[in-house]
Amino acid sequence: KSNELFLNLGFKSVTMDDLARELGISKKTFYIHFKDKNDLILTSIKLKIASEKQICQDCATAGANAIETLISISDFIIEQLSNVNPTLFYDLQKYHPEAWQVMQDHKWKFVYDNIHTNILQGIKEDLYRSNLDPKIIARYYVASIDNMMSPEIFPWPEFKTDSIVKQILRFQIRGLANEEGIKYIKENFNTKINE
């Protein structure tokens, strides 16, 4: 419930009174479970990350190959970010640096490792170009996440986050895929990649 409130109103504008009222508890009860608003946000971020990790691992397990896995994870990300105002991330960085750092650590460890593994898998499956350096491409991909969420680069609501992710996926998957990979995409995902 608190995550919904944060997503709708932003981290900065949600007060302790709002949280207690929305959760249907007194502020006193709230403080029994959480030290302060920062503690709640940190806990919420950690729970969200744990949930997303499991979903990404499920996508990787269910994917028949690297392309299916990448598209499946991207679909999940698009769904999660479809109506998120990027200023939410700015607020998190400015007003809740500990929670922001947890997100950054997650991005540079878990997301990086998954992208790196996906690239290696795609090369091994002969779906991705063999002349790619997985370390460089994975680092580029992770670094581009901040740009996708930057209100200076992509002012909201002119650029919706789900649209940005779709365009970046289209751009990246075509850059990763070799001829065999592009053929596979056209046969299996042409509508999705080009919609």
Predicted regions and their residues:
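C-terminal peripheral helix-coil segments that are non-catalytic and often amphipathic
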Residues: T117-Q121, E125, E158-E195
